[in-house]
């Protein structure tokens, strides 16, 4: 009896073990490789949809579904594929929750919306070797990226395939992908014949060009730590950064032990104390550790710290986070700082160094930058510190390339005015956003066009303009919408005023207003005048010059003269309880000749800019231009006398 019972128990356990094995194998078995992969003599890329299920909440109009997919990148070519990158054009409002063996090249952390498509970069193994160099070892030739995420609207058994998948590495050409069955999208990419094979197959990738580059140079390496120098360099003609904030993500539990030339925005070692770092480094005083955050934020030091022997004394450091374009000052177009990094097991050898991923950089009222993954490049060269006429190579170097993207919405706006119209065309309604909430929509109109203003309203904060704006509308017989249009919500506004237009030339007046709480040091503005720029003569209170942008001499660059390079923040009036706040202001008249621009139509269009940038950030422009008042000659004098009295009357009601 006992023997029979033991036998039955053994049968049950064996069945359970077999079932577990089968279930495990069913879940983990990768999809079989396509036969087309063997026919591809380049890089074979495929996207395979594996499974999907309905998830909460239940919503017939906007139902979410979990999806699991796999990206395969197989190098069947003759040359090693360095730092592979694959673009996937998702099409169903996908939210990516996890991805193995890859990171998002734009630095986004998961979960992340990828509905507009995204680029995957290989990590931790970024390079795919060839069959020739590995004797056909597929594990070194191939990368498999397992994706888990959420998509909307495609219920099983339908398959939410992306619209496109392609290799984006330089030097490769990919045709339109083909669909195999219902769940596979694949493409075979081959070397671009216009690029030599030697360039593709070289040991390191060539340094790339971009609006902003970041070099991560390892200068000293030890078993459990290393030192690195980070160089941020601006290459854009009109781009800049103010109060730059640089962040990245450690991938293997590294932590920031010390810094020179920059500083973490938050000094905190608590994540190490509660994490594996304190268990391994038992004798380390973590009170001296700079940051244990997985994504530390690094900021520049103030000028006063440049000669500080503890945190400063680094060339190109300590400038309050200001990086100017080379067109303004080449010496101030880069920032440099140094860090000391502690590693964790199992990477405790000198050669095991993993650069941080997901780089992001931003500034205060500056262009938005999108950064790619760090790419291994040839080691940087540094002058020998001993003074000998030789260079010293970095232990290893990686380059991060960042490019400017046009944000939506912008952060500055422009108003237009002219000598032939007594009203100002103001900045657009909601020009800089801030109008999406229901509360805002209930208090003002987000769609009504901004009301024309009298000139003196430009000096008054938007919230205090209501009475003056209404009075001006009544005076000009304009209908006042209810509710009134929302404000522009911009931290900086620029007024372009067409001042004169005569036979031999014309003049304009540019006024910059700072409505924010931060001073702008070494500010600049760039104005594109497509037809009028060749006639530029002089900016009387600014330093002005013509610069070539994209090969065209159509842009006037203006910056503050020595001693006038500060655009101060908004401040209280003399009597804060009664007076309006006062914006920081800079103003100059600029003159043009018509000798080089015959036939120019100054008043109708050519005298107004087609693009305006402030500190590298493109500003919102009005949709209409000032027009000539046919009756203005009869009433202008009367209005000039009456307007101040109306303003005074309505502002004191």
Swiss-Prot record:
A Gene Ontology term for the protein's cellular component: side of membrane
Keyword Magnesium: no
One Pfam family this sequence matches: COB_C
Region forming the signal peptide: 1-25
UniProt similarity note: Belongs to the COBRA family.
Biological process (GO), any one: cellulose microfibril organization
Superkingdom assignment: Eukaryota
Tissue specificity field: Expressed in roots, stems, leaves, flowers and siliques.
Propiece residues: 630-653
Subcellular location: Cell membrane
Keyword RNA-binding: no
Membrane topology: Lipid-anchor; GPI-anchor
Name this polypeptide is given: COBRA-like protein 8
Lipid group attachment sites (GPI-anchor amidated asparagine): 629
Entry-listed glycosylation sites: 58, 116, 164, 194, 307, 320, 349, 391, 403, 421, 464, 543, 553
Organism: Arabidopsis thaliana (Mouse-ear cress)
Keywords of the record: Cell membrane, Glycoprotein, GPI-anchor, Lipoprotein, Membrane, Signal
Primary localisation category: membrane
